[in-house]
Swiss-Prot record:
Belongs to the LOB domain-containing protein family. Residues 1-20 are annotated as: Disordered. The gene is LBD2. InterPro entries: LOB. Residues 23-123 form the LOB domain. Disulfide bonds: none annotated. Pfam families: LOB (PF03195). This is LOB domain-containing protein 2. It comes from Arabidopsis thaliana (Mouse-ear cress).
Amino acid sequence: MMQRNSNNTSITSNISNNSSSHQACASCKHQRKKCNNECILSPYFPARKTKEFQAVHKVFGVSNVQKMVRTVREEDRTKLSDSLTWEALWRQKDPVLGSYGEYRRICEELKLYKSLVHNQPLIGWDNNQRVFNNNSNNKNGLAMTNSSGSGGFSVNNNGVGVNREIVNGGYASRNVQGGWENLKHDQRQQCYAVINNGFKQHYLPL
């Protein structure tokens, strides 16, 4: 009799330990049902993601989310849950446009950055590899100066003629109509275009 009671006690303790070790996910908490290892939404909406699940449930519904998770491959289910969460949260922020509004905003930013790339003047460099900007009045051409006085070149409005003269570099080179020629010295140097978009600078190799 005592042995039977001890066995029942051990079984009860094992059951309680298993139930306490598996915390109910956000989906099962919302539905107020017991969560077990077979819950399909448990790995993707744990208890700490209650806010995210509430948004997903409001937009898509629990049964629809379960169907979508079952229809995709297991390795893609995390991406699916992240996508549903992102769409649902943006639907809460913008009930009219939802995630499409964020997509439009990103497209407008991309157009702005591309226009800055095409319209920003070329940036010069000196022998100390310091990048600087010279805002000239040339409409179609470029202008590059050298702050240290060791050399520089400029381009006319047509973007064709080059006037380059090096004072301290050991030689002088001048080419008016030949285009981009004789612009290499004994040591290789790189020229970068710097795009200032108001937040940070991007250095683009020419």
